[in-house]
Swiss-Prot record:
Binding site for S-adenosyl-L-methionine: 57, 86, 105-110
Name this polypeptide is given: Ribosomal RNA large subunit methyltransferase H
Gene it is expressed from: rlmH
Subunit relationships: Homodimer.
Originating organism: Prochlorococcus marinus (strain MIT 9312)
UniProt-annotated location(s): Cytoplasm
Length: 138
């Protein structure tokens, strides 16, 4: 079973759009253990501690449907999974090179703030799938 206390989102910058912040807060109420940190820069050494999994979001990454994403996250067993979202310039190639996976949410390009909301919804959906919750309908 996938649990939100094993998942964290680290993003560069703050959410400025109120409607996106409201959407994120709705999912945070459903997953209070999910860590969401707004940073100025990524410190890969801290995020890598204890063999944590690093997943960078980037439009050139690998795409999964929701069920596949759930399976992928479940395969990481009891490791902590850190999702990294860059700012308007994305994530540096150095950080991408040192990540375990580069994930694309879609072939479309999204503003980084909207990507956070989409990722949080997909995390909630993956947890729901792993718990056989009726939220996900395939």
């Amino acid at each position: 079973m996938l649990q939100s206390n094993r998942l964290a989102i680290y993003a560069i910058g703050k959410i400025k759009k109120l409607w996106i912040r409201d959407g994120i807060n709705q999912y945070k109420k459903r997953m209070p253990e999910l860590i969401i940190n707004e940073l100025k820069t990524f410190n890969l050494n801290n995020l890598r501690s204890n063999n944590n999994i690093i997943i960078c979001l980037s439009e050139e990454g690998k795409q999964f449907n929701s069920v596949e994403l759930c399976s992928l996250l479940l395969n990481f067993k009891n490791k902590k999974i850190n999702f990294l979202i860059g700012d308007t310039d994305g994530i540096s190639s150095d950080i991408k090179k040192n990540s375990d996976l580069i994930l694309s949410l879609s072939p479309l390009t999204f503003p980084h703030e909207l990507a956070r909301l989409i990722l949080i919804e997909q995390i909630y959906r993956a947890i729901s799938i792993s718990n056989n919750s009726p939220y996900h309908r395939s």
